[in-house]
Amino acid sequence: MKKEIHPEYIDCTVTCACGNTFKTKSNKSEIKIDICDKCHPFFTGSEKIVDSAGRVEKFKKKYALN
């Protein structure tokens, strides 16, 4: 690798919306995420609807599912 052309690789704290935090390495010092392995339905086995900008409500209204 060439010297002084690569970004600095530092410790990073990743924070999930559920409150879970963990450490990793990145060129950023802090990363915020919406879903992690502690709250993702695949890993927890529970159902959780992830709504992006009201898409679920729009779908329910369109097909009268309320």
Swiss-Prot record:
Cofactor binding note from Swiss-Prot or TrEMBL: Binds 1 zinc ion per subunit.
GO MF term set: metal ion binding; rRNA binding; structural constituent of ribosome
Binding sites annotated in the UniProt record for Zn(2+): 16, 18, 36, 39
Identification of the protein by name: Large ribosomal subunit protein bL31
Cofactor(s) the record lists: Zn(2+)
Lineage: superkingdom: Bacteria
Cellular component, GO annotation: ribonucleoprotein complex; ribosome
Coiled coil segments of this chain: none
Role played: Binds the 23S rRNA.
Cross-referenced InterPro entries: Ribosomal_bL28/bL31-like_sf, Ribosomal_bL31, Ribosomal_bL31_A, Ribosomal_bL31_sf
Keywords from the named record: Metal-binding, Ribonucleoprotein, Ribosomal protein, RNA-binding, rRNA-binding, Zinc
One of the protein's GO biological processes: translation
Membership in a protein family: Belongs to the bacterial ribosomal protein bL31 family. Type A subfamily.
Pfam families (alphabetical): Ribosomal_L31
Quaternary structure annotation from Swiss-Prot or TrEMBL: Part of the 50S ribosomal subunit.
NCBIfam families in the record: L31 (TIGR00105), PRK00019.1 (NF000612), PRK00528.1 (NF001809)
